[in-house]
C-alpha cells in the first residue's frame, strides 16, 4: 500500500493556520507531525526505522559550527595561518531533516509557498564528455541520444511547477545552467531549455541567464542557439591554461586551443564571458600560476573566478595523489599565497572584486547568481542532483539520472531530501552574503533584524582584528586580504 493512501494530512488547513501575514510558512510543526507519523507507519510499511539515506542526513543535520571554529590564529601572515584546512565547499548549520518517506508531501507544500525575496533558478545538466579528476559533481557520461531524452524530461519537470505559487509572478533575477557540462547538450536542446525558461517563468527584464560549460565541443551552432534563445552569460571552466596541468586533470584542450576558443566566443560580443581558474592543482607552481594570470589579463573576457581546490576524501584526484600517480598538490600556505597573488594581480590590472572569488573586467559581468546562492534568496531547482531553497527550506532532487527520469515519467516531483533551517536562518544567510562580498554592514542588521550584531559578536570581532582579518570602519567592518 502506498503512503499516499495511508496518510491523510490536512495540508490546506495547515497552510492557512501557519502562514504569516507576510506569506511565510512555519514548517517546524509539520516536520514534527511527519516524524510522529513516520514512527507509527514505518513498521506497517516494512520500512526500516533507520534508512541509510536518513542516517546520512541526520549526521549532516547534527553538524555544528562551534565558537572555536571562528577563532583565528594570530600570526604575521593571517591569510596563511589564521584558519585550518578547508574540508568542504559548502557550509553546514543546524537543520531539521524531513524524513525521506514524507518528502513528496513536503515538496508539494513547498512548491505552493510564495517566493518573498530576490530569486534564482538552478538547472543541473548531469552529463560530461570526460570526467575531471578533481570533480565530485560528475553524474553521468554524455551520449548524444541522451540529450533529447534529458531535455524532454527537464521541460516536463519545469511544467510541473509552472502554475504553483512558488513560480507565481515575482521576478526571477538569475538563471544558472550548471552541472555537469550543459554545453555537452545538442544545440537544439540548449535552445529548447533556455526558451522554455523564458516562456514558463517570470524572468526579470535584466535577468542574468548563465550557461556553464567547456570550450571543447562548444561549437558555433551551440553558441548561436544559446544566444538566440536568450542566454546572456557564459561561464567556462578553464581551471588552468597550462597544458600539462590540464591533461593531468583530464581536460582535453591545450593552452593554445583555449585562447583561440575564448577569443572566438568573445568576438560574438553578445554575452558576458567568464572563466574559472582553480588554484592548488597538482603540478601548479608560482611560474605557471603567474602565466595563467597574465593570460587572463590579456584576453577580451568580462570576468574571472578564482576557486581553491578542495581535495575531497575519496575523489579520483585524492586517490591518484595517494597512489603516487599525480604530483602533490600545493599546501594550504602555498594556496593562500596563490590566492593573494591572484587577488592583487587582478586589482592591479583594473578588475573589480565583485566578491571574495569573483572579479569583473567589464561592467557586463554582474555575478548575480553566485551572490544570490550565498544569500537568503529563493531558488527553484530542476534536474537530477539540483538543489533549491524556498523561504529557507532547502531541498535536493534525486541525484541518479535514471531514478530522476523515472520520477518525472511518473509525473512526480523529484525531490529526495529536504531540510528546515533554524529560527534565525535569514540573519545567518544575510551575514554570509555580506562576508562573501567582503564587508559587514552593522547598521543593516540593526534596521532589518533589530539586533546589535556588532555588540553580539564583539569577542569574535576583537579576536579577528588582533589576527589582522578585520578592519573596523564604524558602521562597517571590512575583511582584509
What are these regions (language model features)?
Residues 124-137:
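Local cysteine-cluster metal-coordination motifs and their immediate loop/turn environment
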Residues 475-481:
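Accessory beta->alpha helical hairpin/"wing" motif in late/C-terminal subdomains of nucleic-acid enzymes
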Residues 111, 118, 140-164, 170-451:
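C-terminal scaffold of the Radical SAM
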Residues 465-475:
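A short, conserved structural fragment
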Residues 121-123, 236, 479:
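Short beta-strand motif preference
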Residues 451-463:
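Short amphipathic alpha-helical interaction segments
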Residues 442-444, 455-457, 472:
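Extended hydrophobic-aromatic, low-complexity segments
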Residues 1-36, 40-119, 168:
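Flexible, acidic/Gly-rich N-terminal and inter-domain linker regions that tether
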Amino acid at each position: 500500500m502506498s503512503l499516499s493512501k495511508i496518510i491523510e494530512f490536512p495540508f490546506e488547513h495547515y497552510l492557512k493556520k501557519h502562514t504569516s501575514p507576510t506569506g511565510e510558512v512555519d514548517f517546524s510543526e509539520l516536520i514534527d507531525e511527519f516524524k510522529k507519523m513516520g514512527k507509527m507507519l514505518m513498521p506497517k510499511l516494512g520500512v526500516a526505522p533507520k534508512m541509510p539515506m536518513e542516517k546520512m542526513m541526520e549526521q549532516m543535520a547534527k553538524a555544528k559550527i562551534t565558537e572555536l571554529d571562528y577563532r583565528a590564529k594570530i600570526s604575521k601572515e593571517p591569510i596563511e595561518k589564521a584558519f585550518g584546512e578547508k574540508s568542504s565547499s559548502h557550509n553546514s548549520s543546524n537543520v531539521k531533516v524531513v524524513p525521506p518517506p514524507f518528502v513528496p508531501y513536503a515538496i508539494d507544500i513547498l512548491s505552493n509557498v510564495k517566493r518573498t525575496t530576490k530569486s534564482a533558478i538552478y538547472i543541473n545538466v548531469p552529463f560530461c564528455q570526460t570526467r575531471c579528476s578533481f570533480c565530485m559533481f560528475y553524474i553521468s557520461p554524455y551520449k548524444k541520444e541522451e540529450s533529447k531524452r534529458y531535455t524532454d524530461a527537464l521541460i516536463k519537470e519545469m511544467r510541473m511547477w509552472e502554475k504553483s505559487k512558488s513560480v507565481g509572478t515575482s521576478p526571477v533575477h538569475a538563471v544558472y545552467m550548471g552541472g555537469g557540462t550543459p554545453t555537452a547538450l545538442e544545440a537544439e536542446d540548449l535552445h529548447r531549455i533556455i526558451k522554455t525558461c523564458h516562456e514558463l517563468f517570470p524572468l526579470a527584464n535584466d535577468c542574468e541567464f548563465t550557461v556553464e560549460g567547456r570550450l571543447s565541443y562548444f561549437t558555433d551552432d551551440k553558441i548561436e542557439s544559446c544566444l538566440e534563445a536568450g542566454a546572456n552569460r557564459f561561464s567556462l571552466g578553464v581551471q588552468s591554461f597550462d597544458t600539462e596541468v590540464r591533461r593531468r586533470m583530464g581536460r582535453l584542450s591545450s593552452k593554445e586551443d583555449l585562447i583561440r576558443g575564448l577569443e572566438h566566443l568573445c568576438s560574438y560580443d553578445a554575452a558576458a564571458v567568464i572563466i574559472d581558474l582553480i588554484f592548488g592543482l597538482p603540478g601548479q607552481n608560482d611560474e605557471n600560476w603567474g602565466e595563467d594570470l597574465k593570460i587572463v589579463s590579456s584576453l577580451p573576457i568580462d570576468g574571472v573566478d578564482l576557486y581553491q581546490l578542495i581535495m575531497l576524501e575519496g575523489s579520483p584526484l585524492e586517490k591518484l595523489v595517494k597512489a603516487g600517480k599525480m604530483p602533490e598538490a600545493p599546501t594550504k600556505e602555498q594556496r593562500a599565497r596563490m590566492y593573494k597573488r591572484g587577488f592583487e594581480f587582478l586589482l592591479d590590472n583594473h578588475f573589480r572584486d565583485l566578491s571574495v572569488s569573483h572579479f569583473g573586467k567589464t561592467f557586463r559581468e554582474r555575478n548575480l547568481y553566485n551572490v544570490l546562492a550565498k544569500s537568503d534568496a529563493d531558488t527553484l531547482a530542476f534536474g537530477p542532483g539540483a538543489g533549491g531553497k524556498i523561504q529557507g527550506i532547502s531541498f535536493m532532487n534525486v541525484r541518479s539520472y535514471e531514478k530522476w527520469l523515472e520520477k518525472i515519467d511518473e509525473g512526480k516531483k523529484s525531490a529526495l531530501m529536504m531540510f528546515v533551517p533554524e529560527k534565525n536562518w535569514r540573519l545567518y544567510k544575510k551575514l554570509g552574503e555580506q562576508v562573501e562580498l567582503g564587508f559587514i554592514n552593522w547598521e543593516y542588521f540593526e534596521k532589518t533584524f533589530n539586533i546589535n550584531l556588532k555588540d553580539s559578536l564583539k569577542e569574535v570581532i576583537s579576536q579577528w582584528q588582533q589576527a589582522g582579518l578585520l578592519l573596523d570602519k564604524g558602521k562597517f567592518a571590512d575583511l582584509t586580504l
